[in-house]
């Protein structure tokens, strides 16, 4: 039996991208009147409770972008941020599509890809 794996799978958030640093940098870049680290943490901390609402049937199956937006709206309220336009909220919500990789991610994945099939996933 060959014990060498053929496929390597990697979680996206926290493993191949720096979600926290990326969100905090965006919060700082757009000048939100909030601590960038606290805002990023609050936004991500809303994920499990929101998913629990989906799993329980309180919310129907929801696309992740819509779930992130639902959470964002709550975090903006929590931080008393009321000045953003709808377009600004949409752009901020899509920061999850612009997460930056860790410094060694690209080189590391390319090296692994030369010997294995690689895939990313996220729950």
Locations of regions flagged by a protein language model:
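N-terminal helical cap/lid subdomain that shapes the substrate entry/recognition surface
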Residues: 3-103
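Conserved phosphate-coupling serine/threonine residues in phosphotransfer and NTP-handling enzymes
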Residues: 122
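Catalytic-core regions built around general acid/base machinery
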Residues: 104-115
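Structural signature of beta-strand start/N-cap positions in the alpha/beta core
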Residues: 6, 117-119
């Amino acid at each position: 039996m060959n014990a060498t794996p053929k496929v390597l799978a990697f979680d996206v958030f926290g493993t191949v991208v720096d979600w926290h640093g990326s969100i905090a940098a965006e919060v700082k870049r757009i000048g939100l009147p909030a601590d960038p680290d606290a805002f990023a943490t609050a936004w991500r901390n809303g994920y499990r409770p929101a998913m629990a609402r989906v799993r329980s049937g309180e919310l129907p199956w929801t696309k992740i972008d819509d779930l992130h937006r639902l959470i964002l709206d709550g975090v903006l309220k929590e931080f008393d941020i009321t000045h953003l336009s709808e377009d600004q909220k949409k752009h901020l919500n899509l920061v999850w599509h612009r997460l930056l990789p860790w410094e060694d991610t690209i080189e590391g994945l390319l090296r692994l890809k030369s010997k294995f099939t690689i895939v990313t996933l996220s729950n």
